[in-house]
Each structure stands twice: as structure tokens, then as C-alpha cells.
Amino acid sequence: MSPEDPQETQPLLRSPGARAPGGRRVFLATFAAALGPLSFGFALGYSSPAIPSLRRTAPPALRLGDTAASWFGAVVTLGAAAGGVLGGWLLDRAGRKLSLLLCTVPFVTGFAVITAARDVWMLLGGRLLTGLACGVASLVAPVYISEIAYPAVRGLLGSCVQLMVVTGILLAYVAGWVLEWRWLAVLGCVPPTLMLLLMCYMPETPRFLLTQHQYQEAMAALRFLWGSEEGWEEPPVGAEHQGFQLAMLRRPGVHKPLIIGICLMVFQQLSGVNAIMFYANTIFEEAKFKDSSLASVTVGIIQVLFTAVAALIMDRAGRKLLLALSGVIMVFSMSAFGTYFKLTQSGPSNSSHVGLLVPISAEPADVHLGLAWLAVGSMCLFIAGFAVGWGPIPWLLMSEIFPLHIKGVATGVCVLTNWFMAFLVTKEFNSIMEILRPYGAFWLTAAFCILSVLFTLTFVPETKGRTLEQITAHFEGR
């Protein structure tokens, strides 16, 4: 079939009668690409141990006040939003592999700037650079992994993206116990450097190579990743070079997955995960933990364990079931969390956001301690529920549902939406709590979780066991 053929299909990489692939190098390539999300997670988790270290040991020019500390944590999301746009542009022009290689530059440069910082502006500049790299990695890594994986393991390998993110966060928390902020930034250079070295030996995805009409290179990549090219057919790729045009939004195969992808990112951030993470230390303090920093590590361990569980069962249980189950768990946990605040806080709504988590009820100490444990239990349940579904699956589905020729633009829009919502929710959550009181704010997030369950059951298709071509055909009504 010639490149001018208007037929719109993605590369059909396996004929119906062919044997299932058995190559193991696909797991090595996944690990190499997933070092990007590991770096991304480390950059996100870096601020939690670094801010106390900067306030404790840094010279006067580097001391962070409340405003600077707030921006030190939040500026990553702004850089990541820009990185999402940049990643979407790079994805279709530079390719998946080169985009991953390029994102190592701002990762290493950003941490190097932080290490050499002489004033607060250098700290913020370094964080902005690492945020830019986070945006690119969060977009490109899921796409690369989904395009090299065969259907039987695509859920497992795709879930490794979120697993590596939470592992990176946990690594930053644990390392922060023994390393001060400069050496912690030096450690942050290690994962992207390792990714740079490993990705040099990994192939470009066969799908991208086929869109460039590099048939021999695509077959070589298949042999490297899957062990054999037996049964592979030369695909029709004519329409893949059209690129994205606004007129395409009229086609159901384009606007349906785009709407679903955007909504998944919006609901992920409206679940309240950032609010829970922000208040983890305070909740553990009220439960009488001697070392409140233990909260961060405990939360990180729960995230890693349950994200690993999700990865192991993803290709058996399916995406839709896990998303719905995750949403139900978050509804109950957020409702219980709001109930905790309702029982421990009363009186007129005239407190500032600084004191929102200070109990002002007249309950006896032992009663309040019991309620604090209700909060700890609710928080841990929420984190487990989020990790099983709404943590990894939106990123996995983002990499699965878009046609190949719009993947760069569509994933860029989704990543931009996710990071913009993360910034908006983090920045405005205190204002919402001042208006609705803490219990009202958390009950509102429970309502959003209910909507996410209804959305999942109504609109999200099951992609378990389907090829990417079958998923595209589903949206096109074929």
C-alpha cells in the first residue's frame, strides 16, 4: 500500500494467526524508559525533605521563607505544564526514544543548578528545569512503553510508569533522612544519567519507525524487543503523516478519546490526592507519632505496595474495573476524612488556613486520639485506593486510546491538563477550606470521586487484551 493511501489505520504489527511474542528485552526497554518516571518522582518528592534541610542548614541567602518555600514546591507543576506542551511537540517530530534522551538534560541540569545554588532564585530555577523534564517524561514514557509492549503485558508494563513515580518519591523521602539538600540533589542526577546510558542501546518504537516508512528498522526493533518478526505484516501507514488538524475533531475516533483522556486527568486531580499528601504529616502528629516525618515514608510505602499490586493484576482485572473500585474506595475514605474534621472542628468559620487542622472541639484527649486514628486509617485507605486505580490508570489509558497520528497533540493536551489542575487544586485548596470548612472541602472531593465512578462506568472503554488498533477501531465505530 502506498503512503498516499487515505486509509486511516495504525500499524498492524501482528497478523491474527501469529504466535504471541516471547521476547524479554521489552522488559529491559521498559525499565530504561521508566527511569524517566523514577526521576520525575524523585523531583516531586525532593521538596519535602529539602525544605526543612534548607531552613535548618542553608546559609542566609538560601533560607526559604513561607512564600519561597511554597513556590519551591509549586514551581515544579508550572515547569511540568510547559514540559507537557514541549513533550507533545517532540513526540511526533523527534520520536519517542530521542524525546526520552533529551529530557535527561533538564533533569541533570536542574539538579546541578540546585546543587550549586547561591541564592533562592537559583533554587527556583533548578526546580523549574526539573519540572520541565517531569512534564516531558510523564508524557513520553507511557507512550514509548505502550508502543513497545504486546497486549498481554501492556497493562503490567504501562503501570510501571506510576510505580516508578511513587518509588522515586519514596526514594527522595528515605534519602532525605540521611542526606542534606545539596547531596540529595546530587542523588537526583543519578536516575536520569542511568536512563541516558541505557536508552542509547534501546530501539525506537516500531510504530513510530513505521510512520517514517523505515520498515527494516521497524522489523529490527521488533526482533530486538519481541524476539521474532514471524507473522509480522507490512502495515498501511498513509494517513499517519497527516498530523493533527482541527477538522479532525469532528471524527469520533479523535474527539471521543480526547474528551475521555482530558476528563481522566481532571478527575485524577479532583480526587484530593494532593490535599491528602499535604496534610499527611499533621495527621500523623495528631495520632501521636513521635516522628512526623515517618508519615511521608509510610505514605510512600503504601503507594509503592498498592501500585505494584495494580501492575500485577492490571491485565487480569482490567482498567475499567480497577478504576471503578478505586473510585468507590476513595469515596468512602474521603467521606470518613471529612467526618473526622466535622467531629474535631466546630464553631464559626473565621479561622485562617494556618489553623485549619488544629482541633478546637472540647473532646477528651483519648477521644480525640481515637478520632486522629480514624483520620490516619482514612488517609491510608485513600492512598491505597488511589494507587490501585486512579494513580496509574489515567496515564496508562492516555498512552492506549489515541490514534497514532494525533498522539503527540492529544497526550500533550492531557498532560497539560493534569499539571494545570494539579497547580490549581494545590494553590486553591486552602481557599476552598476557608469557604466550606475542612469537612466541607473533603466531602466535596468525595462528591467528585462519585462523579469519577459514574464517568468510568459510562464512558471509559475496557482496553484489556486489545491491540492499539482494536482500541482505535472501537472509537471509530468499526
UniProtKB/Swiss-Prot annotation:
Highly expressed in adult and pubertal testis, but not prepubertal testis. Moderate expression in hypothalamus, cerebellum, brainstem, hippocampus, and adrenal gland. Lower amounts present in most other tissues. It catalyses: D-glucose(out) = D-glucose(in); D-fructose(out) = D-fructose(in); L-dehydroascorbate(out) = L-dehydroascorbate(in); alpha,alpha-trehalose(in) = alpha,alpha-trehalose(out). One of its GO terms (molecular function) is D-glucose binding. The keyword Flavoprotein does not apply. GO terms for cellular component: cytoplasmic vesicle membrane; membrane; plasma membrane; synaptic vesicle. PROSITE patterns: MFS, SUGAR_TRANSPORT_1, SUGAR_TRANSPORT_2. It is found in: Cell membrane; Cytoplasmic vesicle membrane. Residues 1-25, 92-96, 149-156, 204-257, 315-320, 390-405, 461-478 are cytoplasmic. A motif (Dileucine internalization motif) lies at residues 12-13. It is a multi-pass membrane protein. D-glucose binds at Q162, Q268, Q269, N274, W395. Residues 47-70, 118-127, 178-182, 279-293, 342-368, 427-439 are extracellular. Insulin-regulated facilitative hexose transporter that mediates the transport of glucose and fructose. Facilitates hepatic influx of dietary trehalose, which in turn inhibits glucose and fructose influx triggering a starvation signal and hepatic autophagy through activation of AMPK and ULK1. Also able to mediate the transport of dehydroascorbate. NCBIfam families: SP. Belongs to the major facilitator superfamily. Sugar transporter (TC 2.A.1.1) family. Glucose transporter subfamily. This is Solute carrier family 2, facilitated glucose transporter member 8. It comes from Rattus norvegicus (Rat).
